[in-house]
Amino acid sequence: MSKIAIIGTSGLFPGSSTPEEFWDNLMSGRDLTGLATEADFGVDPAVFFHPEKGVVDKCYSLRGGYIRDFRFDPEGYELPAEYLARQDKLYQWPLYVAKEALRDSGYYQQKAVLDRCGLILGNLSFPTGSSHKQLASVYTNTTEQALQKLLQ
């Protein structure tokens, strides 16, 4: 196993855009969960809901930790700001978090050091409005094909 060093950390959580804010919220016992909205899923959340656990393709709770008040600043990246501003939040969030982790490391914009760096990301943000829009036709086609087979 290769040796690694964690040189910087960052995070984006419900009600918290830094690990420090997140820790403060945890320590003060704040509940930053809420019910899913159409803005979170891109469709009425009731479409995905079923009160019984274990029902295929359904969730039995719509309560979750949703990031809602974060405003992405598309300036200062190696891509055009107008392009980044149009991207889904699932692309914007990791860019923000990676940039903040690099700042935390003290090596932000030090190319010689960063050439030897990697990135580990975690994400629990599906479905989103954009993912629903992108995959709706796939779901529809798959469902139609399955129904046609069943009805033959």
Q: What is the predicted function of each stretch?
A:
Residues M1-Q152:
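Cys-dependent condensing catalytic cores that perform Claisen condensation/acyl-transfer
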